Amino acid sequence: ARATRTIAETCNGIIACLWEYYVSYQPGFPEKTAFIPLPIDLRKVTSRVRCVPEKLNFFIGIQSARSNLKGTDVMLPVLQEVQRKHPDLCRITEVHDVPYARYQQLMDDADVQLDQLYSYTPSMNSLLAMAKGVTVVGGGEPENYEILNETELRPIINVLPDEQDIYKKLEEIVLHKERIPELSAQSVAYVAK
């Protein structure tokens, strides 16, 4: 904490790429804190708006050393419970500790990605998923849209760090998979902005 404060005090500017960082630094350093969203080069991403899938493909990437930080340790068992209840409507692509290039490749066939349970905003993995047209379940709080001045698009299925809320939102998208094309299109548009 002391090193962070020293760096913040002595640097010329603080670029916050997520809402969480902005609200952490802006009160103490308002004159030097600026919000600049994470950049996604859409020329390097193949975007594909998803159709209504016959069987919804959920994607969850797990880094064993960080599972409790990202919330996948909470989301995976809930997702598995939804899949057990609706085996004909959804499936799970679960990947563990794979290199990033392979992770991105495996995500290409997903309809929905689960990531960042404890975040208010999507981070790099979620933004790349959205750029591909994959719907994200994770952090999508109102503050995320407000800092971007986004008043129309709401592509992220926001979940609270609560198993009942996660279950409800996952089951809802399984039972209403006709929403996937709209959420997919909004995801691509959100990243393009």
Predicted features along the sequence, with ranges:
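Membrane-proximal helix-turn-helix segments that form the acceptor-binding/catalytic region
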Residues: 1-14
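Conserved donor-binding/catalytic core segment of Leloir-type glycosyltransferases
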Residues: 36, 40, 44-70, 76
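A conserved nucleotide-sugar
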Residues: 58, 76-104
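Short alpha-helical segment that forms part of, or immediately flanks, the ligand-binding pocket
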Residues: 104, 126-131, 145-146
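Acidic donor-binding loop of glycosyltransferase active sites
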Residues: 108-121, 134
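Short hydrophobic beta-strand element within catalytic cores of glycosyltransferases
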Residues: 135-142
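A short, well-ordered alpha-helix in the C-terminal region of glycosyltransferases
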Residues: 172, 179-192
